[in-house]
């Protein structure tokens, strides 16, 4: 991804990126609806293997989000944590601390029952820190979206030194 401003805030350490992925709980999924953007907040799970990031989302078995993914699988996402406003002596010194991950990828709807179980386990591990197992019947009532991330960046803004 190109065009990042404030490159001094970017970092690439995988362990630090994993901390953000574990700490954040909501991912903002950007989709394309014709010539209009459409963004939806979602809970997520992830798998990071050798620097490759795969995101899993779950939701209803029908709806606008799924229709848009079927029409155009290109997606963009953002997630963040450590959001804390800070004050300054003048207006331009006010700001907010954060840590974020943004990525672009291709979304697909998972049909395989075993992969759906795996995805739901990953989602619950990310959201709760606990391990869960899922029966086949549980996979039938949700749709799993898998995002194969093509590229991602991470960025943070610490609080200013006083």
Regions found by a protein language model. Name each.
Residues 1-23:
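Extreme N-terminal tail/first-helix region
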Residues 2-6, 82-162:
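Charged, gly/pro-rich active-site loop segments
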Residues 11-12, 23-28, 127-130:
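Short Pro/Gly-enriched beta-strand edge/turn motifs at strand-loop
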Residues 20-21, 68-69, 123:
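A generic structural signal for nonpolar/aromatic side chains embedded in well-ordered alpha-helices
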Residues 24-61:
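Short beta-strand segments
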Residues 28, 56, 76, 104, ...:
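Beta-strand secondary-structure signal
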Residues 31-33, 59, 79-81, 149-151:
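Short, structured patches in soluble enzyme cores that scaffold and shape functional sites
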Residues 60, 64-87, 94:
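Helix-adjacent hinge/juxtasegments
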